[in-house]
Amino acid sequence: MDLENKVKKMGLGHEQGFGAPCLKCKEKCEGFELHFWRKICRNCKCGQEEHDVLLSNEEDRKVGKLFEDTKYTTLIAKLKSDGIPMYKRNVMILTNPVAAKKNVSINTVTYEWAPPVQNQALARQYMQMLPKEKQPVAGSEGAQYRKKQLAKQLPAHDQDPSKCHELSPREVKEMEQFVKKYKSEALGVGDVKLPCEMDAQGPKQMNIPGGDRSTPAAVGAMEDKSAEHKRTQYSCYCCKLSMKEGDPAIYAERAGYDKLWHPACFVCSTCHELLVDMIYFWKNEKLYCGRHYCDSEKPRCAGCDELIFSNEYTQAENQNWHLKHFCCFDCDSILAGEIYVMVNDKPVCKPCYVKNHAVVCQGCHNAIDPEVQRVSYNNFSWHASTECFLCSCCSKCLIGQKFMPVEGMVFCSVECKKMMS
Protein backbone atom coordinates (compact mmCIF):
# COMPACT_ATOMS: atom_id res chain seq x y z
CA MET A 1 0.00 0.00 0.00
CA ASP A 2 1.47 3.38 -0.94
CA LEU A 3 1.70 6.34 1.40
CA GLU A 4 -1.17 8.24 -0.23
CA ASN A 5 -3.59 5.37 0.46
CA LYS A 6 -2.31 5.03 4.02
CA VAL A 7 -3.04 8.69 4.67
CA LYS A 8 -6.56 8.31 3.24
CA LYS A 9 -7.28 5.32 5.50
CA MET A 10 -6.38 7.17 8.66
CA GLY A 11 -9.05 7.63 11.28
CA LEU A 12 -9.23 7.93 15.03
CA GLY A 13 -12.00 5.35 15.51
CA HIS A 14 -14.75 7.70 16.69
CA GLU A 15 -17.34 4.93 16.95
CA GLN A 16 -15.18 2.98 19.41
CA GLY A 17 -16.61 3.07 22.93
CA PHE A 18 -19.26 5.64 21.99
CA GLY A 19 -21.58 6.35 24.92
CA ALA A 20 -19.51 4.47 27.52
CA PRO A 21 -19.92 5.94 31.03
CA CYS A 22 -17.04 7.83 32.64
CA LEU A 23 -15.67 6.05 35.71
CA LYS A 24 -14.31 9.36 37.02
CA CYS A 25 -17.10 11.86 36.32
CA LYS A 26 -19.98 9.37 36.76
CA GLU A 27 -23.34 10.92 35.81
CA LYS A 28 -21.74 14.31 35.00
CA CYS A 29 -20.59 12.84 31.67
CA GLU A 30 -23.24 12.08 29.05
CA GLY A 31 -21.13 9.20 27.73
CA PHE A 32 -17.88 8.83 25.82
CA GLU A 33 -17.62 10.75 22.56
CA LEU A 34 -14.15 11.03 21.07
CA HIS A 35 -12.95 14.54 20.22
CA PHE A 36 -12.18 14.84 16.52
CA TRP A 37 -8.40 15.10 17.08
CA ARG A 38 -7.72 15.11 20.81
CA LYS A 39 -7.60 11.69 22.50
CA ILE A 40 -10.26 12.71 25.03
CA CYS A 41 -14.02 12.71 25.51
CA ARG A 42 -15.76 15.78 24.10
CA ASN A 43 -18.26 15.76 26.97
CA CYS A 44 -16.10 15.48 30.09
CA LYS A 45 -12.52 15.96 28.74
CA CYS A 46 -11.32 12.70 30.37
CA GLY A 47 -9.31 10.16 28.39
CA GLN A 48 -10.77 6.99 26.93
CA GLU A 49 -8.99 4.97 29.62
CA GLU A 50 -11.18 6.71 32.24
CA HIS A 51 -14.34 5.36 30.57
CA ASP A 52 -15.86 1.90 30.85
CA VAL A 53 -15.04 0.99 27.26
CA LEU A 54 -14.88 -2.69 26.29
CA LEU A 55 -11.54 -2.81 24.52
CA SER A 56 -10.19 -6.36 24.93
CA ASN A 57 -10.06 -7.14 21.20
CA GLU A 58 -8.84 -3.66 20.30
CA GLU A 59 -6.07 -3.81 22.91
CA ASP A 60 -5.07 -7.30 21.76
CA ARG A 61 -4.81 -5.99 18.19
CA LYS A 62 -2.69 -3.06 19.36
CA VAL A 63 -0.23 -5.24 21.27
CA GLY A 64 -0.27 -7.78 18.44
CA LYS A 65 0.78 -5.07 16.00
CA LEU A 66 3.52 -3.98 18.41
CA PHE A 67 5.00 -7.49 18.42
CA GLU A 68 4.67 -7.93 14.64
CA ASP A 69 8.05 -8.22 12.87
CA THR A 70 9.87 -8.78 16.18
CA LYS A 71 11.32 -11.80 17.95
CA TYR A 72 8.12 -11.93 20.03
CA THR A 73 5.90 -13.30 17.24
CA THR A 74 5.24 -16.36 19.43
CA LEU A 75 3.03 -14.04 21.49
CA ILE A 76 0.76 -13.25 18.54
CA ALA A 77 -1.57 -15.11 16.19
CA LYS A 78 -2.86 -13.80 12.87
CA LEU A 79 -6.58 -13.89 12.24
CA LYS A 80 -7.44 -15.97 9.19
CA SER A 81 -10.11 -13.50 8.06
CA ASP A 82 -7.98 -10.37 7.67
CA GLY A 83 -4.45 -11.34 8.71
CA ILE A 84 -4.45 -8.88 11.63
CA PRO A 85 -1.97 -9.93 14.33
CA MET A 86 -3.67 -10.57 17.69
CA TYR A 87 -1.92 -10.67 21.05
CA LYS A 88 -2.14 -14.12 22.64
CA ARG A 89 -2.12 -12.98 26.24
CA ASN A 90 -1.84 -15.72 28.79
CA VAL A 91 -5.01 -15.99 30.89
CA MET A 92 -4.64 -17.93 34.14
CA ILE A 93 -7.57 -19.58 35.94
CA LEU A 94 -6.99 -20.86 39.47
CA THR A 95 -9.47 -23.09 41.30
CA ASN A 96 -9.36 -23.34 45.06
CA PRO A 97 -11.64 -25.72 47.02
CA VAL A 98 -13.49 -23.88 49.79
CA ALA A 99 -14.63 -25.99 52.75
CA ALA A 100 -18.21 -25.47 53.85
CA LYS A 101 -20.25 -27.13 56.61
CA LYS A 102 -22.01 -29.62 54.36
CA ASN A 103 -20.09 -29.68 51.10
CA VAL A 104 -17.04 -28.33 49.31
CA SER A 105 -17.45 -25.50 46.80
CA ILE A 106 -14.93 -24.36 44.22
CA ASN A 107 -13.65 -20.80 44.22
CA THR A 108 -12.40 -19.78 40.77
CA VAL A 109 -10.08 -16.82 40.22
CA THR A 110 -9.35 -15.63 36.68
CA TYR A 111 -6.33 -13.46 35.92
CA GLU A 112 -6.84 -11.48 32.70
CA TRP A 113 -3.10 -11.72 32.13
CA ALA A 114 -0.37 -13.86 33.67
CA PRO A 115 3.30 -14.41 32.79
CA PRO A 116 3.56 -17.00 30.00
CA VAL A 117 5.46 -19.65 31.98
CA GLN A 118 4.79 -23.39 32.03
CA ASN A 119 5.10 -23.59 35.81
CA GLN A 120 1.73 -22.30 37.09
CA ALA A 121 3.02 -22.27 40.66
CA LEU A 122 5.68 -19.77 39.55
CA ALA A 123 3.02 -17.60 37.87
CA ARG A 124 0.93 -17.74 41.05
CA GLN A 125 3.97 -16.69 43.12
CA TYR A 126 4.57 -13.79 40.72
CA MET A 127 0.99 -12.57 41.15
CA GLN A 128 1.16 -12.76 44.94
CA MET A 129 4.26 -10.53 44.93
CA LEU A 130 2.34 -7.72 43.18
CA PRO A 131 0.31 -5.20 45.23
CA LYS A 132 -3.21 -6.61 45.58
CA GLU A 133 -4.75 -3.56 43.89
CA LYS A 134 -2.59 -4.24 40.82
CA GLN A 135 -3.24 -7.96 40.41
CA PRO A 136 -5.28 -8.30 37.17
CA VAL A 137 -8.09 -10.45 38.58
CA ALA A 138 -11.12 -10.28 36.28
CA GLY A 139 -13.67 -7.71 37.48
CA SER A 140 -11.33 -6.23 40.09
CA GLU A 141 -9.55 -2.93 40.68
CA GLY A 142 -6.39 -4.63 39.41
CA ALA A 143 -8.00 -5.53 36.08
CA GLN A 144 -9.09 -1.92 35.67
CA TYR A 145 -5.53 -0.80 36.51
CA ARG A 146 -4.10 -3.09 33.80
CA LYS A 147 -6.61 -1.79 31.25
CA LYS A 148 -5.73 1.82 32.09
CA GLN A 149 -1.98 1.16 31.86
CA LEU A 150 -2.36 -0.59 28.49
CA ALA A 151 -3.94 2.59 27.17
CA LYS A 152 -1.48 4.93 28.89
CA GLN A 153 1.81 3.07 28.45
CA LEU A 154 1.27 1.74 24.92
CA PRO A 155 -0.71 4.36 22.96
CA ALA A 156 -1.83 3.01 19.59
CA HIS A 157 -0.86 6.36 18.05
CA ASP A 158 2.78 5.79 19.04
CA GLN A 159 3.10 2.88 16.61
CA ASP A 160 0.29 3.09 14.05
CA PRO A 161 0.13 6.07 11.64
CA SER A 162 -3.52 5.25 10.90
CA LYS A 163 -4.39 6.20 14.50
CA CYS A 164 -2.91 9.70 14.07
CA HIS A 165 -4.49 12.95 12.92
CA GLU A 166 -3.70 14.12 9.38
CA LEU A 167 -0.08 13.03 9.01
CA SER A 168 1.61 13.98 5.76
CA PRO A 169 3.12 11.19 3.60
CA ARG A 170 6.58 12.29 4.79
CA GLU A 171 5.50 12.09 8.45
CA VAL A 172 4.01 8.62 7.89
CA LYS A 173 7.29 7.39 6.43
CA GLU A 174 9.34 8.92 9.27
CA MET A 175 7.03 7.39 11.87
CA GLU A 176 7.29 3.94 10.31
CA GLN A 177 11.08 4.17 10.41
CA PHE A 178 10.95 5.29 14.06
CA VAL A 179 8.72 2.34 15.02
CA LYS A 180 10.93 -0.12 13.15
CA LYS A 181 13.97 1.26 14.99
CA TYR A 182 12.53 0.99 18.49
CA LYS A 183 11.25 -2.52 17.79
CA SER A 184 14.74 -3.65 16.85
CA GLU A 185 16.69 -1.67 19.47
CA ALA A 186 14.55 -1.17 22.59
CA LEU A 187 11.36 -3.27 22.78
CA GLY A 188 11.36 -6.32 25.04
CA VAL A 189 9.20 -8.56 27.21
CA GLY A 190 10.24 -9.56 30.71
CA ASP A 191 10.91 -13.19 31.56
CA VAL A 192 9.90 -14.70 34.93
CA LYS A 193 12.32 -17.26 36.31
CA LEU A 194 13.86 -18.43 39.55
CA PRO A 195 17.38 -16.97 39.84
CA CYS A 196 18.80 -20.44 40.53
CA GLU A 197 17.48 -21.56 37.11
CA MET A 198 19.64 -18.94 35.44
CA ASP A 199 22.74 -20.24 37.24
CA ALA A 200 22.36 -23.49 35.33
CA GLN A 201 22.80 -21.62 32.03
CA GLY A 202 26.31 -20.60 33.00
CA PRO A 203 28.02 -17.23 33.41
CA LYS A 204 28.83 -16.89 29.73
CA GLN A 205 25.20 -16.46 28.73
CA MET A 206 24.36 -14.35 31.76
CA ASN A 207 26.98 -11.63 31.35
CA ILE A 208 27.79 -11.66 35.06
CA PRO A 209 30.59 -9.04 35.06
CA GLY A 210 29.40 -5.54 35.94
CA GLY A 211 25.96 -6.61 37.12
CA ASP A 212 24.06 -6.03 40.31
CA ARG A 213 24.69 -9.61 41.33
CA SER A 214 27.43 -10.40 43.79
CA THR A 215 29.12 -13.72 44.52
CA PRO A 216 30.27 -14.28 48.08
CA ALA A 217 33.69 -15.66 47.18
CA ALA A 218 36.60 -13.75 45.68
CA VAL A 219 38.22 -14.94 42.45
CA GLY A 220 41.08 -16.58 44.33
CA ALA A 221 38.63 -18.66 46.32
CA MET A 222 36.53 -19.93 43.42
CA GLU A 223 38.09 -23.37 43.67
CA ASP A 224 36.30 -23.87 46.99
CA LYS A 225 33.51 -26.29 46.13
CA SER A 226 31.55 -25.93 49.35
CA ALA A 227 27.84 -25.16 49.06
CA GLU A 228 28.26 -22.06 51.19
CA HIS A 229 30.64 -20.47 48.68
CA LYS A 230 28.75 -21.66 45.62
CA ARG A 231 25.55 -19.95 46.75
CA THR A 232 24.93 -16.68 44.93
CA GLN A 233 23.43 -13.57 46.47
CA TYR A 234 21.04 -11.62 44.24
CA SER A 235 19.88 -8.03 44.58
CA CYS A 236 17.11 -6.22 42.72
CA TYR A 237 18.37 -3.80 40.06
CA CYS A 238 15.70 -1.29 41.10
CA CYS A 239 15.46 -1.30 44.91
CA LYS A 240 18.90 -2.90 45.56
CA LEU A 241 17.38 -5.17 48.23
CA SER A 242 18.21 -8.86 48.32
CA MET A 243 16.05 -11.40 46.55
CA LYS A 244 14.64 -14.13 48.78
CA GLU A 245 15.61 -17.66 47.85
CA GLY A 246 12.80 -19.37 45.95
CA ASP A 247 11.08 -16.12 44.92
CA PRO A 248 10.54 -15.46 41.20
CA ALA A 249 12.51 -12.69 39.52
CA ILE A 250 12.04 -10.81 36.26
CA TYR A 251 14.81 -10.71 33.70
CA ALA A 252 14.97 -8.33 30.74
CA GLU A 253 17.00 -9.73 27.87
CA ARG A 254 18.04 -6.33 26.53
CA ALA A 255 19.38 -5.40 29.96
CA GLY A 256 21.46 -8.58 30.21
CA TYR A 257 20.86 -11.56 32.44
CA ASP A 258 23.11 -10.14 35.14
CA LYS A 259 20.20 -7.85 36.13
CA LEU A 260 16.98 -8.91 37.77
CA TRP A 261 13.96 -7.28 39.39
CA HIS A 262 11.37 -8.07 42.03
CA PRO A 263 7.96 -8.42 40.27
CA ALA A 264 6.71 -5.22 41.98
CA CYS A 265 9.94 -3.37 41.03
CA PHE A 266 9.68 -3.99 37.27
CA VAL A 267 8.46 -0.44 36.64
CA CYS A 268 8.97 2.46 34.23
CA SER A 269 11.80 4.71 35.40
CA THR A 270 9.71 7.81 34.56
CA CYS A 271 6.13 7.14 35.73
CA HIS A 272 7.07 4.34 38.17
CA GLU A 273 4.03 2.30 37.18
CA LEU A 274 4.22 -1.48 36.75
CA LEU A 275 5.24 -2.27 33.18
CA VAL A 276 1.99 -3.64 31.79
CA ASP A 277 2.27 -7.32 30.81
CA MET A 278 6.04 -6.92 31.45
CA ILE A 279 6.41 -5.04 28.12
CA TYR A 280 9.43 -2.77 28.44
CA PHE A 281 11.73 -0.49 26.46
CA TRP A 282 15.43 -0.39 27.42
CA LYS A 283 17.56 2.72 27.04
CA ASN A 284 20.67 4.01 28.82
CA GLU A 285 20.52 1.29 31.48
CA LYS A 286 16.90 2.16 32.35
CA LEU A 287 13.48 0.56 31.89
CA TYR A 288 10.74 2.61 30.25
CA CYS A 289 7.12 2.05 29.32
CA GLY A 290 6.34 2.66 25.65
CA ARG A 291 5.02 6.19 26.21
CA HIS A 292 8.00 7.45 28.16
CA TYR A 293 10.55 5.77 25.92
CA CYS A 294 9.00 7.58 22.94
CA ASP A 295 8.95 10.83 24.95
CA SER A 296 12.70 10.45 25.45
CA GLU A 297 13.17 10.21 21.67
CA LYS A 298 10.60 12.62 20.18
CA PRO A 299 8.61 15.68 21.28
CA ARG A 300 4.95 14.93 22.04
CA CYS A 301 2.10 17.30 21.21
CA ALA A 302 0.29 18.41 24.37
CA GLY A 303 -2.84 18.90 22.28
CA CYS A 304 -3.33 15.60 20.44
CA ASP A 305 -0.93 13.45 22.52
CA GLU A 306 0.84 12.27 19.35
CA LEU A 307 4.57 12.26 18.71
CA ILE A 308 5.68 15.15 16.52
CA PHE A 309 7.39 14.16 13.27
CA SER A 310 7.04 17.58 11.65
CA ASN A 311 10.10 19.84 11.43
CA GLU A 312 7.98 22.79 12.54
CA TYR A 313 6.21 22.88 15.88
CA THR A 314 5.74 25.35 18.69
CA GLN A 315 6.79 25.37 22.34
CA ALA A 316 4.73 27.09 25.01
CA GLU A 317 4.36 26.66 28.76
CA ASN A 318 7.18 24.06 28.79
CA GLN A 319 5.20 21.86 26.40
CA ASN A 320 5.36 21.02 22.69
CA TRP A 321 2.54 21.49 20.21
CA HIS A 322 1.80 20.84 16.56
CA LEU A 323 1.27 24.28 15.03
CA LYS A 324 -2.37 23.42 14.23
CA HIS A 325 -2.99 22.01 17.72
CA PHE A 326 -2.01 24.99 19.88
CA CYS A 327 -5.68 25.69 20.48
CA CYS A 328 -8.10 26.67 23.21
CA PHE A 329 -8.91 23.58 25.28
CA ASP A 330 -12.56 24.65 25.47
CA CYS A 331 -13.47 25.85 21.97
CA ASP A 332 -10.49 24.68 19.79
CA SER A 333 -9.81 28.15 18.38
CA ILE A 334 -6.18 28.68 17.28
CA LEU A 335 -4.19 30.59 19.92
CA ALA A 336 -1.18 31.73 17.88
CA GLY A 337 -0.79 35.47 18.58
CA GLU A 338 -3.82 35.49 20.92
CA ILE A 339 -4.13 36.09 24.65
CA TYR A 340 -4.65 32.84 26.56
CA VAL A 341 -4.74 31.66 30.17
CA MET A 342 -3.44 28.30 31.44
CA VAL A 343 -6.11 26.36 33.34
CA ASN A 344 -4.93 23.02 34.78
CA ASP A 345 -1.97 23.07 32.36
CA LYS A 346 -4.32 23.58 29.38
CA PRO A 347 -4.42 26.81 27.34
CA VAL A 348 -7.79 28.57 27.23
CA CYS A 349 -8.65 31.61 25.11
CA LYS A 350 -9.70 34.81 26.89
CA PRO A 351 -13.43 34.63 26.01
CA CYS A 352 -13.67 31.01 27.20
CA TYR A 353 -11.73 31.82 30.35
CA VAL A 354 -14.10 34.66 31.26
CA LYS A 355 -17.13 32.51 30.43
CA ASN A 356 -16.11 29.20 32.02
CA HIS A 357 -13.23 29.66 34.45
CA ALA A 358 -12.92 33.24 35.70
CA VAL A 359 -13.36 33.92 39.39
CA VAL A 360 -16.21 36.21 40.40
CA CYS A 361 -15.54 39.46 42.24
CA GLN A 362 -17.08 39.53 45.73
CA GLY A 363 -17.64 43.26 45.30
CA CYS A 364 -19.41 43.70 41.95
CA HIS A 365 -20.24 39.99 41.35
CA ASN A 366 -18.85 40.12 37.81
CA ALA A 367 -16.16 37.86 36.33
CA ILE A 368 -12.61 39.16 36.79
CA ASP A 369 -10.77 39.63 33.49
CA PRO A 370 -7.48 37.62 33.41
CA GLU A 371 -5.50 40.78 32.55
CA VAL A 372 -6.96 42.82 35.41
CA GLN A 373 -5.30 42.98 38.83
CA ARG A 374 -7.18 41.31 41.63
CA VAL A 375 -6.98 40.72 45.37
CA SER A 376 -7.46 37.14 46.60
CA TYR A 377 -7.88 35.75 50.07
CA ASN A 378 -8.64 32.07 50.65
CA ASN A 379 -11.29 31.22 48.03
CA PHE A 380 -12.51 34.81 47.58
CA SER A 381 -11.39 37.41 45.03
CA TRP A 382 -12.05 41.10 44.30
CA HIS A 383 -11.12 43.50 41.55
CA ALA A 384 -8.15 45.47 42.88
CA SER A 385 -10.08 48.72 42.45
CA THR A 386 -11.53 51.47 44.63
CA GLU A 387 -15.01 50.38 43.52
CA CYS A 388 -14.77 46.72 44.57
CA PHE A 389 -12.26 46.08 47.34
CA LEU A 390 -14.13 48.02 50.05
CA CYS A 391 -15.08 47.59 53.68
CA SER A 392 -18.39 45.72 53.71
CA CYS A 393 -19.70 48.15 56.34
CA CYS A 394 -18.42 51.69 55.69
CA SER A 395 -17.22 51.25 52.05
CA LYS A 396 -13.70 52.45 52.86
CA CYS A 397 -11.18 51.44 50.16
CA LEU A 398 -8.95 48.65 51.53
CA ILE A 399 -6.24 48.52 48.84
CA GLY A 400 -2.92 48.59 50.67
CA GLN A 401 -4.71 48.55 54.05
CA LYS A 402 -5.13 45.93 56.75
CA PHE A 403 -8.50 44.19 56.68
CA MET A 404 -10.52 41.56 58.52
CA PRO A 405 -12.07 38.83 56.32
CA VAL A 406 -15.33 37.19 57.45
CA GLU A 407 -17.10 34.70 55.13
CA GLY A 408 -16.58 36.59 51.90
CA MET A 409 -16.88 40.03 53.49
CA VAL A 410 -13.99 42.31 54.48
CA PHE A 411 -13.91 44.96 57.20
CA CYS A 412 -11.57 47.84 57.95
CA SER A 413 -11.97 47.58 61.74
CA VAL A 414 -13.43 45.60 64.62
CA GLU A 415 -16.10 48.29 64.99
CA CYS A 416 -17.33 47.82 61.41
CA LYS A 417 -17.33 44.06 61.86
CA LYS A 418 -19.47 44.39 65.02
CA MET A 419 -21.93 46.67 63.24
CA MET A 420 -22.52 44.02 60.56
CA SER A 421 -22.80 41.07 62.95
UniProtKB/Swiss-Prot annotation:
Name the principal localization, coarsely classed: cytoplasm
Which purpose does this protein serve, as stated in its record? Answer: Scaffold protein that may play a role in cell adhesion, cell spreading and in the reorganization of the actin cytoskeleton. Plays a role in the regulation of cell proliferation. May act as a tumor suppressor.
Q: Where in the cell is it found?
A: Cytoplasm; Cell junction, Focal adhesion
Its UniProt domain note says: The N-terminal and the C-terminal halves of the protein can associate with each other, thereby hindering interactions with ZYX.
**Which InterPro entries does the annotation name?**
LIM1_Testin, LIM2_Testin, LIM3_Testin, PET_domain, PET_testin, Pk/Esn/Tes, Znf_LIM
PROSITE patterns, alphabetized: LIM_DOMAIN_1, LIM_DOMAIN_2, PET
Per UniProt, subunit arrangement is:
Interacts via LIM domain 1 with ZYX. Interacts (via LIM domain 3) with ENAH and VASP. Interacts with ALKBH4, talin, actin, alpha-actinin, GRIP1 and PXN. Interacts (via LIM domain 2) with ACTL7A (via N-terminus). Heterodimer with ACTL7A; the heterodimer interacts with ENAH to form a heterotrimer.
Upper classification of the source organism reads: Eukaryota, Metazoa, Chordata, Craniata, Vertebrata
Task: Tell me what organism the protein belongs to.
Answer: Papio anubis
Task: Give residue spans, biased composition: Basic and acidic residues.
Answer: 155-164
**GO BP term, example:** negative regulation of cell population proliferation
Q: Source gene?
A: TES
User: Which Gene Ontology cellular component terms are annotated?
Assistant: cytoplasm; cytosol; focal adhesion; plasma membrane; protein-containing complex
**Region (Disordered) residue spans:** 133-164
**Can you say what this protein is called?**
Testin
Reading the lineage from the top rank, the first entry is Eukaryota
